[in-house]
């Protein structure tokens, strides 16, 4: 069996795990991170795209609100390439409690958050699609953040700092010695071959899988899982983040991300981190709540729906049974040896994507204490440099295309929706070969535009054929995965396009496995 040795083994490749690995590398630790899927395939890649100002938590969790505000400012400095400074508003509608805006505003001031009440008439001039029935409006420091971009630059920073990131490597067990974990048994999911990694300390950053990972160590981790459903609209009628000024509840936010608007979110307790099934009533509720802010949005085209799992630390008696909306979003760092568990493992649970850097800093402070090292955190002042091929915001692509030499470049365009060209794909394949079409989607946004892979998928599969073991099966899997998000919003123009794409693949291209409406 192949063997590796490291100081820190980090389990989980979401924002938390990658942030911990980055901080650890900068502090001089030898680091190996394992992730059972691709970067961005878990909770961090399944959120609504909001960089929190902290205002959402001013009433319910003031300390978390302050943390979000602090980290918001830091991330704007160190990861600006992944952030669009949209700004945001908290808005009071006729359906919201009259008492809440004043209570919320007082809490924001007590938490030292930047909040400014603005005239509704002024806001309507800026955002004319908003409901004229809004009674009060408050400007906050919200922004939108592309988590795929963020995760990729984190991974790049880890590799450049000397760390190792092993994708599609799954933990299957720990090796104990005298009550302390000393090694991990790993399976390479691409080759089905085993790997043993010895370590001095393991850090469990598995998100919704953290309890499962802890079980391998003989530790019960009381996690409550909350499923949140989101709907992406195929247009961007507003340019700022919109929040309902009311106690946190379902459907209280609209986030403009790239060329779409994301309606979010629901919060339903689940027991399995794989339970991502979207219910019709969730989609209906999100659209109905969005209508309160943007009249007519229910008649606009819904692009797709998806769900993510929030891992929340709960009191042991409540884990898995309590309504997850009422549970706190703060993070916790659990040294299991100090809690009468085995040595050699720490778990990091809870938190927000906005606070991932702070979570990593606090975790590494604990690690440094364990190792007897005195090395200060430097991530708050270290810029995360983007790889040129990674960032594909539409305005950037438009500018690049506008400055190209004259000529016929139509054949270069693979994805018309997201303006991805052949060269983009070839550069991605040369730099870091994706294993699947879905990997390339997270890299370049292939298949994420209005056609939802209808026209770009077969072109991309043709280019990737040399690196795909079974191109036809991979294309079928990619299309079916895209259609999972289309089915919950399959009405009107979306339903028409689904039928058009089905017939395109089945009748024109003669594809033996066209997407279908079956579940």
Per-range role (PLM):
Residues 4-6, 191-201:
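Core beta-strand elements of the Rossmann-like FAD/NAD(P) dinucleotide-binding domain
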Residues 147, 221-229, 236-237, 241, ...:
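C-terminal catalytic lobe of FAD-dependent flavoproteins
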Residues 204-218:
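Flavin (primarily FAD) binding-site architecture
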């Amino acid at each position: 069996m192949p063997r590796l040795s490291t100081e820190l083994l980090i389990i989980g490749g979401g924002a938390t795990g990658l942030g911990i690995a980055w901080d650890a590398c900068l502090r001089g630790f030898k680091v190996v991170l394992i992730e059972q899927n691709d970067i961005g395939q878990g909770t961090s890649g399944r959120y609504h795209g909001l960089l929190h100002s902290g205002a959402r938590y001013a009433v319910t969790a003031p300390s978390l609100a302050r943390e979000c505000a602090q980290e918001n400012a830091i991330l704007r400095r160190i990861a600006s390439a992944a952030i669009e400074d949209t700004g945001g508003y908290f808005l009071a509608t006729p359906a919201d409690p009259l008492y809440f805006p004043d209570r919320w505003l007082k809490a924001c001031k007590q938490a030292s958050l930047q909040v400014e009440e603005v005239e509704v008439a002024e806001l309507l001039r800026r955002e004319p699609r908003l409901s004229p029935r809004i009674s009060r409006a408050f400007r906050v420091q919200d922004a939108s953040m592309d988590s795929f971009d963020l995760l990729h630059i984190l991974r790049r920073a880890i590799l450049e700092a000397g760390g190792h990131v092993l994708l599609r490597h799954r933990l299957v067990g720990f090796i104990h010695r005298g009550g302390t974990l000393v090694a991990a048994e790993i399976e390479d999911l691409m080759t089905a071959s085993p790997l043993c990694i010895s370590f001095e300390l393991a850090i469990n950053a598995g998100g919704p899988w953290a309890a499962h990972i802890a079980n391998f160590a003989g530790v019960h981790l009381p996690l409550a899982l909350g499923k949140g459903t989101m709907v992406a609209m195929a247009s961007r009628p507003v340019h700022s983040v919109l929040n309902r000024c009311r106690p946190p509840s379902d459907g209280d936010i609209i986030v403009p991300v790239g060329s779409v608007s994301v309606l979010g979110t629901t919060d339903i307790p689940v027991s399995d981190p794989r339970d991502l099934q979207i219910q019709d009533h969730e989609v209906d509720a999100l659209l109905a709540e969005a209508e309160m802010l943007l009249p007519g949005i229910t008649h606009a085209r819904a692009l797709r729906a998806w769900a993510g799992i929030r891992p929340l630390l709960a009191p042991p008696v409540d884990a898995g049974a309590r309504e997850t909306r009422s549970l706190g979003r703060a993070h916790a760092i659990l040294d299991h040896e100090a809690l009468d568990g085995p040595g050699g493992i720490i778990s990091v649970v809870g938190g927000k994507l906005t606070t991932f850097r702070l979570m990593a800093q606090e975790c590494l402070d604990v690690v440094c204490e364990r190792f007897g090292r005195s090395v200060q955190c430097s991530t708050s002042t270290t810029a995360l440099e983007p790889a040129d091929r990674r960032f594909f915001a539409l305005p950037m692509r438009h500018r690049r295309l506008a400055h190209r030499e004259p000529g016929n470049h139509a054949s270069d365009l693979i994805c018309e929706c997201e303006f991805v060209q052949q060269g983009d794909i070839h550069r991605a394949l040369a730099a870091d070969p994706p294993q699947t079409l879905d990997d390339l989607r997270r890299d370049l946004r292939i298949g994420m535009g209005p056609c939802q892979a209808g026209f770009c998928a077969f072109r991309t599969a043709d280019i990737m054929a040399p690196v795909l073991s079974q191109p036809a099966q991979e294309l079928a899997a990619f299309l079916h995965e895209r259609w999972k998000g289309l089915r919950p919003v399959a009405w009107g123009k979306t339903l028409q396009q689904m039928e058009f794409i089905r017939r395109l693949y089945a009748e024109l291209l003669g594809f033996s496995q066209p997407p279908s409406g079956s579940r």
